[in-house]
Amino acid sequence: MPDVRIRPVSAALGLGLIAASASAQDQVHGTRSERLYERSHDVRATLHHGWAELRVRRRVENEGPRHDQAMIWISTPAGAAAVGLKTLGTLAGQPRWFSGELMEAEAAAARYRELTGIGGYYPKDPALLSWRSEGQLLLQVFPVAPNGDKTIEYTLLVPTRYKDGAHRYDLERLGTESLPATLSVAPPGRGDRLLVNGKPSAGGALGATGKTTELALVPKSSEPLGGELAVAATGTRHVTRFSIEAAPEVSRVPRGAQVVVVIDASRSLSDEQVDAQKAAAAAYLSHFRDAAVEVVTFGRKAQRRYGTWVAVDRARRDLVATHIERKNGSAVDEALLEAEGILAAAPAGRPRRLVLTTDAIVRSRLKPERIRAAVGQSGAVVHLGILAGDGPALTRNDDHLWAPAARTTGGLVWRAGASADAGARKQMVAVYEEWARPLRVDHVKLYSPDLEVGAIGEVPQVLDEGQGYEHLLFTQRDVSWVRVEGELWSKRVERVLHPDAAAGKRWAALAFGSSLLGELSEPEMMKLALAGAAVSPVTSYLAIEPGVRPSTEGLEHGTVGFGSGFGSGAPSLRMGATSTLGRAPPLDREKWLKDALGTSFAACGGKAGTATISLETTFAEVVDVARVTLPAPRDPVLERCVSEAAWDLVLPPQFDAEWTTWAVEL
């Protein structure tokens, strides 16, 4: 395992970490006095497919006599990553949010210390969000003026789990012991449904989070299989996360179907078995609302019950009331031929279904080939139910000799347990829905040419509708695609997952809330943190607004400890510095720009050595792309492509000059 060392902190800070970890609650303190209080803590949750965003807004108030620093120890929700920071200030007399910049942790801490100190320069008012330990962040805000307040906002991402047809997250109580957070939930996206504590919701305010809140998003889905592939490079390997999801409903009962139910009436069956077949047929038909039905019974010969199509409700009533006389013979093949003929003669254009139940005790000359020859004429999906057991149960039997015949139609052979008892009726209806429509994806397999043997893990062979599987791992190769395949009844379905850029960025951040954290080296952490814009052991957010405090009201060195701090004699806290990188290593910045933009230029279709791009940076930010110079004739499409690539650059922390112009030859 890579050696991940965290700098030691003061004794007071260590006690604070222990207390916060044990209580799993936030703590809010002032540095100079005990009269700094948190007045509001609002959380806005937005659920997405596979993740949720928590936008957290907090306001602190200072009733002390001097400008003070707010120290907010944040116990993050399970799996969370912090990906943004803003502080509310004023500009030209108007309220304005000032967004934070993600920086190397040491550099952010040094900059915060510089900005909060006493000096004769024009003051700036910063907020620093830094990593303290897994599951805990520290938010430092200075200054909070006497009798004034300060509002800050940070953004957390959390992974959801897909279960029972919904993307779910159980949000535990947030806030301090005395002030629980107030929760609101954004309305769901178009077509999706939101559940709060198991009940439908349109979103809105939910009030204080006094206990765990169960949030769920039921996705609108037209495909039986879904999922996501996320890949984030660490420099030496990749964080790879894939998920597969069976839709909340992988299929639907067809409307206007033509259905023939075939019941074995041979004498090898008991009266109870005949009644069980009738109960199974009635339970199956209960899922059709507007089907046309014919019933066929068979011994040596097949016999139609009606000689015409009847409404599904009538067929169900008659099945319960009609006595079926048992006869010699078990001509399954003749019964199938009769049913196929009925369906083939029916008007075209409607879904067709054929269900036959039997004990499969048949003549020896009835070979599987005859069953195969008896089906397929009408195009109906054929299910063959072999009676087995007394209680309601259905299990596919792909090893049965008749299975190949049924599979050619899209249907299956089943072990069918049934009961005519009134007490079993509800369970019968639930079980026999699987003949009306597929309820699960069977024979699930995953494949990718970029995954090592055994890397995928124990993939479930069956995914019931509404259930999923996910896996997070390191891979040596950049996974280009993952194919998921399975069967609905006997129909093959598949989904090919390609890397999603947004998901890759998201999981670059969420890796810091995952089980992979302890295996990351510091260079890998930096790579992922910059890609995911996340607070990490090596990165922090620093938000700066124009200052309003007197320059004499800065923080004295040694007074930035935990709690009230001053006069305690406790060691000072190195703010926001949990990185062991120290100073960022030297970097040829012009070469970095040339390499990064050269790659983009080539991807845009440019020829090396033919272009120059002029841009300006302020610290690690591209503030202007002045022009792109290309040889004649002018190519506006190429110019635009290269310009957009420059605007998309993520500069490393070694770009630390206040203002620089660059002319980069590509």
Feature-to-residue mapping (PLM):
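N-terminal, polar/Ser/Thr-rich
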Residues: 17, 22-50
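Asparagine-centered strand-capping/turn motif at beta-strand->loop junctions
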Residues: 60-66, 74-76
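An acidic, Ser/Thr-enriched
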Residues: 73, 84-132, 136, 140-262, ...
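Extracytoplasmic/secreted cell-surface and envelope-processing proteins
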Residues: 162-164, 269-272, 302-307, 332, ...
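Von Willebrand factor
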Residues: 253-309, 315-357, 362, 384, 388-398, ...
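VWA/integrin I-like adhesion module and closely mimicked acidic/polar interface patches used
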Residues: 360-408, 414-417, 422-430
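Charge-biased low-complexity segments
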Residues: 556-666
